[in-house]
Amino acid sequence: MGIQLKNINKSFNNVEIYKDFTLNLPGNEISCILGPSGCGKTSLLNMIGGIIHQDSGSIEGLEDKIISFIFQEPRLLPWKTVKANLEFVLKDVNLRKKDEIVERNLKIVGLQDFSRFYPGQLSGGMKQRVAIARAFCYPSNLILMDEPLKTLDPKLKWGLMKTFLNLWREDQRSVIFVTHDVDEALVLGEEIFVFSRPPVKVKKRYTNPLNEEEKDMTNMEFFRQKNKIMDHLD
């Protein structure tokens, strides 16, 4: 089941960010929210995640949702090892099953040899891979991603996108991914929603036509689809 936002209103300091805003997000897909910085993308995630509340309107489809987050910064516990950071979200799982889940996810993100390392011993990209693995260890059915690739260089970003897709294919869940980067949207998003500046409207809903081979920034079809989306961006 998807998520429906109906007639959402939200203001900050008397500035209307959302006014009678309605949006339907599909279930069990990667939905990408694409728009300029400051347009309210993070606020949307925070409303869905229950971190903040809308002034009025309703959000439906969350009744059965268990949510995990992937933030811009990894937010790992520095006094715990990589393995212990993942185990931390598996408190109610027996030891054998816990080890199995942690080992599987660390292997998919390519960090099986770093399980005893501490966050301070890892690079920024490695920390974010741990954060992604942790989100998939947690028994959630909805993952909210708030620009987790924003501060990374292009090579690291590309590797992390592939890492995320590998995990998602192994364990498909509903994902809402926020970004201002068209390349990220085309690589990760199945449905792409282009937001305007506030008060927010959906300028374009775009079903991603690219296959796996075409999800390459050097591919001509990728370049063509990127230009189509950019025509709708503020």
Residue spans for each PLM region:
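The feature captures the beta-strand-to-loop junction immediately N-terminal to the Walker
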Residues: 34-36
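Helix-to-loop junction immediately C-terminal to a conserved catalytic motif
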Residues: 49
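ABC-type ATPase nucleotide-binding domains, specifically the catalytic core motifs of the NBD
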Residues: 53, 84-99, 108-109
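Conserved signature/switch motifs of ABC ATPase nucleotide-binding domains
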Residues: 117-120, 138
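Hydrophobic anchor residue at the start of the ABC signature
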Residues: 132
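Catalytic Walker B motif of ABC-type/P-loop ATPase nucleotide-binding domains
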Residues: 143-147
